[in-house]
């Protein structure tokens, strides 16, 4: 059985991003105790921009040394469009998540947010990216595993007002994944990530000054959380998403990214001493099986 090496590599990049997002959950929770959602999002986004522009300068400087005629910004107009559209989607999804996350349990919040694992294949039909039977089955298996991990024995599926915001968040994240799928093959991954976070930072800053009154002391209190989320969760993990989604089916990408829930649970188990029941471990196993099943090449009919 011959696996697609590029697909496997890109899936592993997305899994690494999901690992960073999963372990960043504690940092986000701590940071939210000091500053409002828009302040936290603005601070981490500007920090991500600072981190990414250094990478852009280093990479483009090296490329222009080899060929002085190479433009600094690759496909500038498309980069502007992609950065704005992806940034708006990321800002809206992150804001909806932050607003809704305080209204329900962590388990239900994790489940509702990660529902993009089934929304992406559905949106793919409208974007001309039909997932196929195998990937559709794998997405459903991943959803079943997500339910066992997050909700089995804990919550009902009755939704409150804030939980509808989390459902909206999952739809917006699905759109963001599809937008990255559209733009990433045509653009430099690091440059697109910078443009995306620049748009997110500008929008977050506007909303911060309209709806919140942050102080320097508050931001200082959340500094460690902002640094972790800004550099690793935003600067590194979302860049891994953009690079990893190149030439990868968005359904596989969504399954890899929703492994964030598994890594978050495992981090709590290993680092914080939290317990995982047999049902929750079975959910983790199902989600891992779905990811591995998605890597198996389909038989080509002659």
Model-found features: residue ranges?
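Helix-helix packing/entry segments at the starts of transmembrane helices
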Residues: 18, 43, 109-115, 179-201, ...
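Hydrophobic transmembrane alpha-helices of multi-pass small-molecule transport proteins
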Residues: 52, 131-152, 170-173, 204, ...
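Glycine-/small-residue-enriched transmembrane alpha-helix faces in small-molecule transporters
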Residues: 1-43, 87-88, 92, 96, ...
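Specific transmembrane alpha-helical segments of multi-pass solute transporters/efflux pumps
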Residues: 20, 24-25, 53, 59-113, ...
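Hydrophobic alpha-helical transmembrane segments of multi-pass integral membrane proteins
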Residues: 8-13, 39-58, 80-81, 135-144, ...
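C-terminal transmembrane-helix exit sites in multi-pass transporters
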Residues: 51-56, 116-137, 262-281
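C-terminal-most transmembrane helix of multi-pass membrane proteins
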Residues: 3, 45, 56, 60-61, ...
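Hydrophobic/aromatic residues within transmembrane alpha-helices
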Residues: 31, 40, 44, 100, ...
